[in-house]
C-alpha cells in the first residue's frame, strides 16, 4: 500500500472521516531501517507525527493546529480554562475541573489536542473518556506529552 494513502486512512480512522484532506501536500516520510515501516512524517523539516507500533499516530502540536482547520477534528479536542493554561503549556497534566469543553470523540488512550481560545497549546494522551471528563470534577483527564514550548 502507498505510504501516503496509509497515512490518510490512519488519520481518517483515528480522528474522523475527511480529516486527511487537511494533510499538507509537501510531506516527507522516513522509514524504519529494520522493519521498513513508516516511522516519522515531516513538513519542511518540522515533525508532524510518528506512527506507533500499535497502529496509532502520535501527533505534534504543530500538526494538531493544521488539522484544526477541520470542524470534525475539533470533536477530538478539549479546551482548558485560563487558570490552567500556563501549567499545561509547561507540560503539566490537565485536570477534569479545568476542562471548559471537550469533544465527544475523546476515548481513553487517544491523542487529545488541548486548546485555549481555539489555539492548540499542547497534545496529550487521554486518561478518561469525554463522558467521564464531563461528569467528573476531580482527577487527571489528559497527560500532556507535547507542548508548543517544547523543543522540536
Task: Identify the role of each PLM range.
Residues 5-37, 43-101, 105-108, 112-152:
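Beta-strand/loop-dominated core regions that host nucleotide or nucleotide-derived cofactor-binding catalytic loops
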Amino acid at each position: 500500500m502507498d505510504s501516503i494513502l496509509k497515512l490518510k486512512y490512519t488519520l481518517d480512522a483515528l480522528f474522523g472521516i475527511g480529516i486527511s484532506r487537511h494533510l499538507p501536500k509537501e510531506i516527507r516520510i522516513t522509514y524504519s531501517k529494520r522493519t521498513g515501516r513508516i516511522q516519522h512524517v515531516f513538513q519542511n523539516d518540522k515533525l508532524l507525527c510518528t506512527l506507533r507500533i500499535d497502529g496509532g499516530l502520535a501527533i505534534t502540536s504543530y500538526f494538531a493546529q493544521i488539522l484544526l482547520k477541520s470542524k470534525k477534528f475539533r470533536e477530538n479536542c478539549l479546551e482548558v480554562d485560563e487558570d490552567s493554561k500556563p501549567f499545561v503549556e509547561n507540560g503539566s497534566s490537565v485536570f477534569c475541573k479545568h476542562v471548559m469543553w471537550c469533544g465527544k470523540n475523546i476515548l481513553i488512550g487517544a491523542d487529545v489536542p488541548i486548546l485555549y481560545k481555539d489555539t492548540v497549546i499542547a497534545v496529550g494522551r487521554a486518561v478518561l473518556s469525554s463522558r467521564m471528563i464531563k461528569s467528573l470534577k476531580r482527577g487527571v483527564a489528559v497527560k500532556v506529552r507535547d507542548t508548543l514550548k517544547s523543543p522540536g
